[in-house]
């Protein structure tokens, strides 16, 4: 890949959903809450490399640009080069992948990563073990969550709580087996660099997107 910002072919995937993962926009359906898969015991207390990943964190520059910011974090980690959130915003806006008024459609999260040559998989109904295995393999993870539940866990008990935010999962800390933590780069809060949440709180916030995640990795050389 050369040094141009975006050098892969244009993507032709059409928008298939009107659901959004941004502030104030309601996702119309709630996902089934799968049981938290049992983890047989990681070789390391912390899965992933949160110390390296949190170097790329910053606050999102626009109210609804969380998914763009998370894709910037991931691209910088995997490609070992810097990107500008504003340049990514402009590129996404020109292709209708981002709307400043409503954010990023769930089907468009990851398209910026594909545009810079990364491999992307989008999945729903994942488990925390799926995330842990991806992190252990050096892959990067973006999840759709409800940010209000992350801040006020009791809100998970209210009906109609939907996904409205994107975060990067940068690690899972099993050093206390009775109280594992999920480590995030959350671009929407000032203390979001490497912020830690109890696993059960994260799962409640994550289930509002049907446990949706984008898994990104470098493409293997031909």
Sequence positions of predicted segments:
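Short, flexible active-site-adjacent loop segments at beta-strand->alpha-helix junctions, enriched
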Residues: 72, 147, 188
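Noncatalytic regulatory segments and standalone regulatory/sensor domains
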Residues: 9, 14-23, 31-44, 99, ...
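Extracytoplasmic/periplasmic, Sec-exported soluble proteins
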Residues: 58, 62-67, 101-105, 123, ...
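Extracytoplasmic/secreted envelope proteins and their assembly/folding machinery
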Residues: 67-75, 85, 106, 110, ...
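Mid-length scaffold segments of soluble, non-membrane domains
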Residues: 104-126, 136
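Active-site-adjacent substructure of cysteine-protease-like catalytic cores
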Residues: 124-185, 221
């Amino acid at each position: 890949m050369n040094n141009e910002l975006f050098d892969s072919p244009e993507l032709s995937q059409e928008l298939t959903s009107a659901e959004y993962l941004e502030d104030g926009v309601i996702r119309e359906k709630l996902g089934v809450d799968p049981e938290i898969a049992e983890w047989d015991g990681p070789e390391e207390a912390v899965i992933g490399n949160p110390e390296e990943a949190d170097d790329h964190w910053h606050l999102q520059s626009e109210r609804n640009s969380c998914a763009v910011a998370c894709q910037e974090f991931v691209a910088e980690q995997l490609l070992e080069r810097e990107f500008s959130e504003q340049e990514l915003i402009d590129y996404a806006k020109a292709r209708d992948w981002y709307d400043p008024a409503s954010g990023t459609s769930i089907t468009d999260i990851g398209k910026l990563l594909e545009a810079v040559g990364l491999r992307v998989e989008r999945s729903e109904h994942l488990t925390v073990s799926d995330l842990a295995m991806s992190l252990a393999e050096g892959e990067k993870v973006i999840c759709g969550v409800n940010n209000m539940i992350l801040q006020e866990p009791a809100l998970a008990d209210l009906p109609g709580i939907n996904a409205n935010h994107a975060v990067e999962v940068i690690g899972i800390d099993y050093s206390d087996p009775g109280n594992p933590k999920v480590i995030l780069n959350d671009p929407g809060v000032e203390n979001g660099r490497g912020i830690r949440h109890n696993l059960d709180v994260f799962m409640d916030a994550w289930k509002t997107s049907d446990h949706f995640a984008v898994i990104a990795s470098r493409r293997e050389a031909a």
